[in-house]
Structures are given as structure tokens and as C-alpha cells.
């Protein structure tokens, strides 16, 4: 608005030719002073945004950026490849680069397409178009993503996902942190003898896809992986689905919420809506929202509570006009793992809002099958892994012809070699990489080279040659001109 008014003022002053120059100068000066005053209000006044309060204080940048529970991972002795996770604040999502640990949270203005596809297909809510924040603490996805450790501050144990066991307590900066180890983590490379196409995976309900992916590798063209059984659907018994859709037995809205089956309208802040159901024991429970959208408003927060009254999860709903709207159709809110079955979920709306949705449901994913799936994938795992700059080397003893998936995001620039022979890399499990391996002992090597690096070096060299030739010709031309004169 200020920019528009300034532009109109300049146009007006230019068109009014008879206006004295001193008045024009005074108008421009006055406009400049007003702009400074407005900027000051926006930066410092609490009623106009107080933008300065969001800035990091001088001298505290590193401390703020690394103020994550994962800062204690330097005291964990483990030479294997793994990733670590902790619930993070926005300011610490780049901490892994500073503290040099492998995490599952990062900020990047350009996320890779396969990664975006994975988060959408899995109904994940822990991401935006510019950042990833883990896998919603879903045990099946953590296993595939090599998430081996989770760190929590003391008193947050109720958020612990399935399969994590305490291995160490660490005192740092007068705060106790507990390190938990995932008992169901997969190694960097693991194998399958079954594959399924992405098209067929999409025919399976979103909450069940993660379980399928631990039994059959997802590839774009299964016919290119003939050594593995092509699982067309789950009806032939080769794929098991233990997850269940749970009937919602009741919905209770307080006086500030209405729900007609397609629209939820909250007319006041902290309005609540409670879903009642009879869940499953020893399960992760998910709230499934299909077609969730908010036509008006930029963003609004919804939080979710379960039996103990503690918030287990929250989600920021972004309006359709919001630049960072993920444009996904299905959302799975992880209400957490519990040994006892969950029986209700309270949804709290932090402000007035109206949201539309096509379906609202509860799903439960039993966790007992997870260990057997992981053990099957680990039977012929990548071993003796060596991580070097832009290079990964490991060995495998394959009992038969198989398909190996790596917990490395798929992107151009990677090349794979089996016993020194280059082999094709497939996009596997939507966002990861996979290759063929034959029966027997093999050495696997992965190399990374930034796409376009070689051609850019060639262009640079050619440009320097052209530039040098131009300088020489110009110098000779100058000499010839001097002689002629």
C-alpha cells in the first residue's frame, strides 16, 4: 500500500507542471518521513506486528540455531549410518548442518519432486513446500527412513513412538535429555523379493500404504524388476494389511462448533469438537481428513488431544490462497502410539475458522507386525558401510536375486555400481533409490556428482578461452591502429 501511494504521489508531482519545485521537494521529503514512521511501527510496535521480536538477538545466532535436544547426540557412540529425530522449533530445523548429524528435518526453498510425492502419498502433515519435519513419528515410516535415535527433554515421555527404548540420559546446560533407540530401524540398504507399482499402491487406502511398502518395494515399472514377484493387489495373500478403519460412534461439538458432515465451523477461539470411537490396542491411531481445505483465511492451527489430556499433535491449516499450501488431498494426523486402545480425540481450534472436508475417519495401525517386516528386509542388508565425500561403499551377501532399496532420497546426480559395473537406479518407495542385485556376494558403490557440474566446467573453460581471444584481438587491433596513425 505504501509503495502504491508513493508511486501515485510521484506520478501526480510529475504531471502537475505548475507546482513549484520547493513544494515537490517538500512532498517527497514528507512522504519519506511518513514511510520511515510506518516502517518503525511495523518493526517495533506490538500493535503493528513487532517484526523485530522475531529476529535473533545479536551474539546468540549459533546458540539459537542449535538449541535442539539433538545437540547431545555427540555423546552417542555409534559408527553405523543412522538418522536422529526430535521435535524441533522452526529456528533449529537447520541444526543438522551445524552439529553434523543426520536428521530428518531441514529447510530448503526447493524440495525434490519425489520427496514431495512421498509426503503427499503418505498423508503426512509434517511438511510445507519449503521444509520437512520428519515422518510424524510413524513407526513404519521411521523404519524406512533409518530413524534410529530420538531425543527428548525430561517430562516428554508421553510422546514416545513405538519401539523406542531408553539407552542413555545426558545432562547438558542443566537439562536432562533422554536418548531412545529404535528397535525396528532398517539399515541404509535393505532388500525385497516383491514389488508393486505406484499405480496399484495408490489404489490402496492411504493409511494402509506404509504397511504395504514394508512388504513390497514400490517402483514405477515393476516389469523392469523381473527377479521380484509383482504384487498387483492385496487380494492374493502375498500382502497383509493389519490396519483397520474404526467406526466413529459419536461426535460432540461445543456451543462454538458446528459440523454438518462436510463443513466444520468454529465461531470462537479454543472451540472444541470431540470424536468417540473404540480403537485397537498396541496401535498407532490416526485421524484421517480427506479433502481438507480452508477457502477464507491465510492459516489457522488445530490441535489434537487424547485420553491423558495432553496435546499429541497440532497442524497448521493453510488457506487455499496461502503460498505454502501443500495442495495435498489426504491428511493423516498421528494421534500417537498407545498400548491401551484410544477411545476419543478432542480437536481444538485456535481461532475462528471454517474448513471443508470430504471425509473424517479414524484408523488404527497395529504395531506388532512391524518387527517381522523389518527382520525380513534386514535379512540381506548392506553391511560394512563406508561413507566418504560423495561416495558410499558397502557389501551384501544376497541369498537370491533381489531388489535393494537405499534410505537415500532419489534425485539426479547419483550413479550405482555393483562389483564395479554401472547399474540402473530406480525410484523406489516413492522417494528413495533402488537397484537390482543378483544372488551372491557383491560390493555396492554409490557415487554422487552435482548435476550439470561437468558441463558448467566446460562452459566456463570455453568462455575463458573466448574471453582471452577477444582480449588478444582487441590488443592487436589497438596496435595496428596506432601504426596506421
Regions found by a protein language model. Give the residues of each.
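Beta-sheet entry/capping signal
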Residues: 26-37, 81-84, 148-149, 176-179, ...
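A cross-kingdom signal targeting lumenal/periplasmic-facing segments of multi-pass membrane
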Residues: 105-198, 202-245, 323-334, 338-344
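Conserved residues at the C-terminal ends of beta-strands
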Residues: 87, 153, 363
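Primarily extracytoplasmic ectodomains and periplasmic/lumenal surface modules that are beta-strand-rich
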Residues: 91-92, 158, 184-189, 401-402, ...
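Active-site-proximal, structured, solvent-exposed surfaces of multi-pass membrane proteins
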Residues: 239-485
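Membrane-embedded transmembrane-helix bundle of lipid-linked glycan/lipid transferases
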Residues: 1-55, 442-443, 454-485
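Extracytoplasmic/lumenal acceptor-recognition loop(s) of multi-pass membrane glycoenzymes
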Residues: 34-60, 72-145, 186, 192-194, ...
Amino acid at each position: 500500500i505504501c509503495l502504491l501511494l508513493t508511486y501515485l504521489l510521484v506520478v501526480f508531482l510529475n504531471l502537475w507542471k505548475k507546482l513549484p519545485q520547493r513544494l515537490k521537494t517538500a512532498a517527497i521529503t514528507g512522504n519519506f518521513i511518513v514511510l520511515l514512521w510506518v516502517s518503525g511501527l511495523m518493526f517495533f510496535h506490538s500493535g503493528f506486528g513487532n517484526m523485530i521480536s522475531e529476529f535473533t538477538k545479536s551474539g546468540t545466532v549459533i546458540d539459537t540455531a542449535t538449541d535442539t535436544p539433538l545437540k547431545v547426540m555427540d555423546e552417542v557412540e555409534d559408527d553405523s549410518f543412522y538418522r536422529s529425530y526430535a521435535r524441533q522449533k522452526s529456528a533449529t530445523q537447520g541444526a543438522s548442518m551445524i552439529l553434523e548429524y543426520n536428521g530428518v528435518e531441514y529447510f530448503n526453498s526447493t524440495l525434490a519432486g519425489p520427496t514431495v510425492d512421498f509426503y503427499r502419498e503418505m498423508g503426512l502433515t509434517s511438511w510445507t513446500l519449503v521444509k520437512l519435519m520428519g515422518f510424524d513419528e510413524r513407526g513404519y515410516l521411521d523404519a524406512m527412513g533409518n530413524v534410529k535415535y530420538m531425543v527428548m527433554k525430561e517430562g516428554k515421555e508421553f510422546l514416545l513412538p513405538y519401539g523406542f527404548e531408553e539407552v542413555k540420559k545426558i545432562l547438558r546446560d542443566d537439562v536432562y535429555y533422554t536418548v531412545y533407540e529404535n528397535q525396528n530401524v532398517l539399515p541404509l540398504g535393505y532388500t525385497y523379493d516383491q514389488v508393486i507399482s505406484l499405480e496399484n499402491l495408490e489404489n490402496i487406502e492411504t493409511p494402509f500404504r506404509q504397511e504395504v511398502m514394508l512388504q513390497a518395494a514400490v517402483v514405477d515399472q515393476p516389469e523392469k524388476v523381473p527377479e521380484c514377484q509383482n504384487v498387483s493387489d492385496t487380494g492374493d495373500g502375498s500382502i497383509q494389511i493389519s490396519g483397520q478403519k474404526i467406526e466413529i460412534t459419536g461426535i460432540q461439538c461445543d456451543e462454538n462448533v458446528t459440523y454438518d458432515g462436510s463443513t466444520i465451523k468454529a465461531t470462537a477461539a479454543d472451540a472444541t469438537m470431540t470424536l468417540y470411537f473404540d480403537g485397537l490396542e498396541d496401535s498407532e491411531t490416526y485421524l484421517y481428513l480427506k479433502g481438507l481445505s480452508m477457502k477464507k483465511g491465510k492459516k489457522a492451527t488445530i490441535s489434537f488431544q487424547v485420553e491423558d489430556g495432553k496435546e499429541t499433535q497440532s497442524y497448521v491449516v493453510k488457506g487455499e490462497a496461502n503460498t505454502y499450501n501443500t495442495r495435498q488431498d489426504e491428511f493423516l494426523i498421528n494421534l500417537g502410539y498407545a498400548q491401551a486402545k484410544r477411545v476419543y480425540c478432542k480437536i481444538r481450534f485456535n481461532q475462528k475458522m471454517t474448513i471443508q472436508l470430504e471425509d473424517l475417519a479414524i484408523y488404527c495401525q497395529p504395531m506388532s507386525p512391524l518387527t517381522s517386516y523389518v527382520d525380513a528386509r534386514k535379512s540381506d542388508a548392506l553391511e560394512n558401510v563406508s561413507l566418504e565425500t560423495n561416495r558410499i561403499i558397502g557389501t551384501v551377501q544376497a541369498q537370491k536375486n533381489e531388489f535393494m532399496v537405499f534410505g537415500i532420497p532419489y534425485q539426479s546426480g547419483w550413479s550405482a555400481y555393483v562389483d564395479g559395473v554401472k547399474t540402473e537406479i530406480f525410484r523406489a518407495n516413492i522417494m528413495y533409490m533402488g537397484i537390482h542385485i543378483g544372488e551372491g556376494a557383491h560390493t555396492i558403490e554409490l557415487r554422487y556428482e552435482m548435476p550439470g557440474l561437468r558441463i558448467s566446467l566446460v562452459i566456463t573453460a570455453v568462455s575463458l578461452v573466448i574471453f582471452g581471444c577477444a582480449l588478444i584481438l582487441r590488443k592487436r587491433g589497438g596496435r595496428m591502429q596506432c601504426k596506421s596513425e
